[in-house]
Amino acid sequence: MNNNGTTNETDRKLNKEADMPGTGENKKFTINISVRNLVEFIMRSGDIDNRTAGAMSKQAMAEGTKMHKKIQGRMGIEYKAEVTLKIALEYDNYCINLEGRADGIIAEDIVVVDEIKSMYADVMKFTEAQQVHQAQAMCYAYIYAKQHNLDKICVQMTYCNLDTEEIKRFRTVYTFEEIEVWFESVMAEYIRWADYIADEQKRKMDSIQHLEFPFEYRNGQRNIVVSVYKSILAKRNMFIQAPTGVGKTISTIYPAVRAVGTGEVDKIFYLTAKTITRTVAEEAFEVLRRNGLHFRTVTLTAKEKICPCDETICNPDKCKRAKGHFDRVNSAIYEVITHESSITREVIEKYADEYEVCPFEMSLDISNFMDGVICDYNYVFDPYAKLKRYFTEGITGKYAFLVDEAHNLVERAREMYSAILTKEDFLSCKKIVKDRSKRVSNALDKCNREMLSLKRMCIGTSDRYSYTILDETEDLVLSLLRLQTTLEKFLDDNKEFDKRDEVLELYFAVRTYLDIYELVDSKYVIYSDFNEKGEFFVKLFCVNPSGNLQDCMQTGIATMFFSATLLPVNYYKELLSGDIDDYAIYIDSPFDTHKRLVSICKDVSSKYTRRNENEYIRMLNIIREVVSGCDGNYMVFFPSYKMLEDIYELAIREGFTEEYEVFCQTGSMKEKEKEEFLATFDVDRDKSLIGFCVLGGIFSEGIDLKNERLIGSIIIGTGLPMVCSEREILKNYYDENNRNGFDYAYRYPGMNKVLQAAGRVIRTDEDYGVISLLDERFLRRDYRQLFPREWNDVKVIDSKNAGEIVRHFWKYV
């Protein structure tokens, strides 16, 4: 037995620590569902149609809430507003808790249940209540009538226009027998879904009781498993720094599944930044299924990627799947969930084709019935892409978030919580709508004038890093608020016109800006500048996204951040969770350090002042010396495409490409080209293969070239991001907040790219390889202190002894 313990011992300890319950022989399983979710799921029909301004903006929702209260306040003392209604429905093997809140109960001769819906549509043209709205009110009416022993009850639908405040009402009186028969018919439709949920729950919980870790633990792996498990049960976030090859995916998924078995977690969200890591997560869940786990997962794919149409235009006139989608989708969902456990992209596409439904929308609905959801960060953290069904403001769930390759989340989150407006877009849209709506045209003109005023304040014209920090943009925001309301109504009233998509795009940009503006605090910088086209823009730049991410994390119970490159961990704590006291563990590499050589070349540098042909020749010679030590496959990572191209041209001239086969990454590789590039590393060759790649690009992380597919990673430069306005803003911001601004803006992001590229080598116990860092700056303490602990045996080389040291390594390895 090693010091990490055997698999069975660890599983027994987890059982003891959890005091895992049984499946509940004496207590029925409970299904909780809201009235609104019930009727919207069971009674939906018709088409997908995106030819509106989309979901109501926060401003419109706020206006709707105000209108609700206004209407309720006018109704008199007999009107009781916001009445919570709930009922427990007992079935053989489970109980359904149905709950909702009626907008109003009116005490008249016949009690009236009032349901209010506010909108920008012309409600005076309505001839009857919409079916789903009526059904929601009827459910409330049934619950109230049953609990108050009423013979009759009235349902009132109140529709109100947010612009004109015009109101139209529809009243229907039901006997209790009528509404009971109707309600039972609705529940009869839902029962097959409830039966499925209850049966799956029992099978899942039973299987978890006997689930063991599927492998013998590697060094450090048990530590991850136990730490993740304890953190979830303690409802604490944790950061896990663990090198490639430890098995981070299975080591986080397994304890999260065991936590599901305790009842502390209902659903696991496995969050990734790249498609390849989603596949690894799918495989990990599949390994557990082969070991007896009954656990259903779905992988969500971006709409643009999974859409089968040439253009992603979601309306019945442009897409045959959108037409009648909601008439067919429930049958498709039931077929999928009753026949599949691992619902991958391919599975989604297969059933979506069969039932002619939108694969993206179907996958979101399927997630409701799943135990695990594998998806991009966006679906949990992005304010617009996040799954509203789980992460609506004020609603929490028993969710565990597993964040893979968490180092990527810093920049992704900055993008999610920033917003930008470009002055020229207002002028372009004004030209489109000027003959259609004077009101919209005037609102656009007002915003353009506000942008022009800010432009005059901008100190820059053609100077580098000529941004201007803005203390406030309140006048612009007021104009944007008026424009948003005007555009929302205009787009709802005008479903088809030339260049409508451009107007819709501006509407979304304005809405995003206003929503993000509400989040602006001390962790934001508002600035203006000119883009590469010379266009003036204003940006709300989120320099520290931790507060926004924390709001999202609080919708679940615990978040596990893990990566091979979370150094220094306090930097990531500060920018991701905002809590320096969050748990953290460091896992040492399980691999034999004698099987790899890490070296630093002391007489080259990629500094801008040193970028010349002489320096490039020296770099090329060192690459030749490193590669000559052993025939095989290598990757060389350059700090930019420009340097890659310059050195490649030099390699041709110097005869380097005759000695070795060289393939170059290009700036616009499609998925197929990426696969072809990686496939070159699978072919046996007479001479060494060298891939010229860009540091921080698609081949420097997230690829898995095991065994002899890659035996060397040569990294040129320290990975520092290019100096630009936003990097300088970050640097100044952190300097002003008592941090080392250069570290936060440049050094830490750069070293992360270096460590990721180095991690492409040594993926398994059988691997051998060399990692060569070609830049004298790596010898400095401020860089070496960012090295992983296992790099304590780094060798210093130069252009004279590099070949000798590398050949010595390969001779005795």
Predicted regions and their residues:
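A substrate-engagement module of RecA-like helicase motors
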Residues: 205, 211-212, 264-373, 378-381, ...
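Conserved RecA-like P-loop NTPase helicase motor core
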Residues: 604-612, 668-777
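Metal-dependent nuclease catalytic cores that hydrolyze phosphodiester bonds in DNA/RNA
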Residues: 2-110
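Signature of the SF2 helicase/ATPase Hel1-core->accessory helical subdomain module
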Residues: 355-356, 360-372, 377-478, 566-578, ...
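A contiguous, basic/glycine-rich beta-loop/short-helix subdomain that forms a polymer-engagement track
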Residues: 353-368, 384-391, 490-602, 615, ...
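Mg2+/Mn2+-dependent nuclease catalytic core
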Residues: 87-181
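Conserved pre-motif I regulatory segment
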Residues: 201-239
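Walker A/P-loop
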Residues: 234-254
